[in-house]
């Protein structure tokens, strides 16, 4: 509780908070990137919210005038997410996945680590060593999801879908064209292979939309 209160205070001064985390030699570079990027009042889409770690962090950065829409398809993770943000009036949570089609999809969810849930069974040894359950869940396209169409502006899309990132992006193409949001996501080559695409396909997607691509290296954003 105390840690959460202190972080809420630090988030009022994000650049100062970055400095503190650097002094503490924090290696959570994604968090550093969010601190340097997100502004009060922003509207954020959190795809693959899991148990709400970043959802809750975003709420601290955007303040009361911002809004977060968080998507999590796995019921057990969604329940934890729901409890974590239940008193946040500017946070809307959706128990669905996000993809390039509106349909029911199969998810492979490690029982001990729902954060590694994926719509494909990966071939890497670490992932294969985990005990998994298969869960069927509705998935939606961001472009077709009515609650998002009511937003006047979308400032940031965060994606963590263990390889399905390009599918999410393809289902959000019109939203991206209209809003030109900042997009931050993890890109794992092994996970991409399971979905039959590569880093080059991601680069081509963003080039077609006139985006500048960056890679987080340590605590810096490097143009690529």
Predicted regions and their residues:
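Phosphate/nucleotide-binding beta-alpha loop and adjacent structural elements of enzyme active sites
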Residues: 1-224
């Amino acid at each position: 509780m105390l840690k959460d209160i202190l972080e809420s205070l630090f988030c009022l001064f994000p650049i100062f908070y970055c400095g503190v985390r650097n002094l503490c030699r924090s290696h959570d570079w994604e968090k550093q990137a969010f601190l340097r990027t997100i502004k009060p009042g922003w509207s954020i889409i959190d795809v693959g919210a899991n148990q709400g770690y970043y959802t809750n962090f975003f709420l601290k950065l955007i303040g009361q005038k911002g809004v977060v829409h968080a998507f999590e398809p796995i019921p057990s993770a969604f329940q934890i997410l729901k409890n974590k943000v239940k008193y946040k009036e500017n946070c809307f949570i959706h128990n669905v996945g996000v993809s390039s089609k509106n349909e029911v999809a199969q998810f492979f969810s490690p029982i001990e680590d729902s954060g590694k849930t994926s719509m494909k069974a990966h071939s890497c040894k670490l992932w294969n060593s985990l005990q998994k359950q298969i869960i069927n869940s509705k998935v939606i396209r961001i472009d077709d999801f009515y609650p998002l169409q009511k937003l006047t502006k979308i400032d940031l899309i965060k994606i963590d879908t263990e390889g399905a990132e390009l599918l999410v992006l393809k289902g959000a193409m019109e939203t991206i064209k209209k809003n030109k949001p900042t997009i931050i996501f993890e890109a794992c080559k092994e996970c991409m292979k399971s979905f039959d695409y590569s880093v080059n396909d991601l680069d081509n997607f963003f080039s077609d939309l006139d985006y500048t691509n960056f890679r987080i290296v340590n605590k810096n954003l490097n143009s690529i």
